[in-house]
Amino acid sequence: MGCTVSAEDKAAAERSKMIDKNLREDGEKAAREVKLLLLGAGESGKSTIVKQMKIIHEDGYSEEECRQYRAVVYSNTIQSIMAIVKAMGNLQIDFADPQRADDARQLFALSCAAEEQGMLPEDLSGVIRRLWADHGVQACFGRSREYQLNDSAAYYLNDLERIAQSDYIPTQQDVLRTRVKTTGIVETHFTFKDLHFKMFDVGGQRSERKKWIHCFEGVTAIIFCVALSAYDLVLAEDEEMNRMHESMKLFDSICNNKWFTDTSIILFLNKKDLFEEKITQSPLTICFPEYTGANKYDEAASYIQSKFEDLNKRKDTKEIYTHFTCATDTKNVQFVFDAVTDVIIKNNLKDCGLF
């Protein structure tokens, strides 16, 4: 009897080859689909990272889209100066020029209608300009850790002349600096290095967290954002709770969650620019009384990094990938995200048995 291969055997071998090919293709397709979850406490920079993805990977904001942010820029600017002026009363700081008290009254009288209309009328921009130039207002701004103030306050107020122009169109940087509280889940899609990313930005305030849970299934990596500059601030929603401590508590619960045993965890220690400005004026012992190092950027930032990384209870099997970031700096985010993507590619290929 010869060793001829029957037609059935040949067909079976072909089928088997085809199944293997399909499995491999499915594996490669799965390895190319990346589900990224952006987590972190409120105001840690998650939404700014999402905006950067649009700028870096999707041609940025069109002129029309930038125009739509004009009302948000005005609202952020008005809210910022109002927060400072209100805080002056609580902190018992007087205006350097008593005439500014009239401007403060004007500010509160005009701001409501301006915000509703998404405008910055000339009389209101004049009021804001005079208030912002007052030494008493500047002294109060210098104590902003004692009340709630947007990070972008000085950015907009210092540039009032430009944004108050009647033909003003926000720049990409203006858009990046806007602050709108994220409620619910914002999903962004983009392609980079032959990977198809789905990025989910989840509201960070406590009231938002119960909405996170169903997002977790099948997630490739978590980017956890921490505002380095929040070490001397309290929460907007709980004035007893230090923001950095809240962030550590949340990171602990995410990093050691049984659901995320196989999920890459990437830690963005964000707002490094604000932290560098602040650390020489406001000691780290406000947040960590046991800290004995210098109030210098490198030493203090390394200490915070070790505090977060030490929360990882599975150091032997789980690595935390830490990066220092400035979410409003496009080049920095581009550089960091490139490194993050390489880690994801490597881990993905490993999971699919292709590495």
From Swiss-Prot:
The source's domain of life comes to Eukaryota
Q: Does the keyword Lyase feature in the UniProt annotation?
A: no
- What name does UniProt use for this protein? Guanine nucleotide-binding protein G(i) subunit alpha-2
**Impact of altering residue 122 to A?**
Increases sensitivity to RGS14 GTPase activity. Does not increase sensitivity to RGS14 GTPase activity
Q: What is the effect of changing residue 92 to K?
A: Increases sensitivity to RGS14 GTPase activity
> Which parts of the sequence are annotated with region: G5 motif?
325-330
Phenotype for residue 82 to I: Increases sensitivity to RGS14 GTPase activity. Does not increase sensitivity to RGS14 GTPase activity
What phylogenetic lineage does the species belong to? Eukaryota, Metazoa, Chordata, Craniata, Vertebrata
Q: Where is the lipid attached (S-palmitoyl cysteine)?
A: 3
Biological source species? Rattus norvegicus
Q: Which GO terms describe its cellular component?
A: cell body; centrosome; ciliary basal body; cytoplasm; cytosol; dendrite; exocytic vesicle; heterotrimeric G-protein complex
What Gene Ontology molecular function terms does this protein carry?
G protein-coupled receptor binding; G-protein beta/gamma-subunit complex binding; GTP binding; GTPase activity; metal ion binding
List of residues binding Mg(2+): 47, 182
Q: Where in the cell is it found?
A: Cytoplasm; Cell membrane; Cytoplasm, Cytoskeleton, Microtubule organizing center, Centrosome; Membrane
List residues with covalent lipid attachment of type N-myristoyl glycine: 2
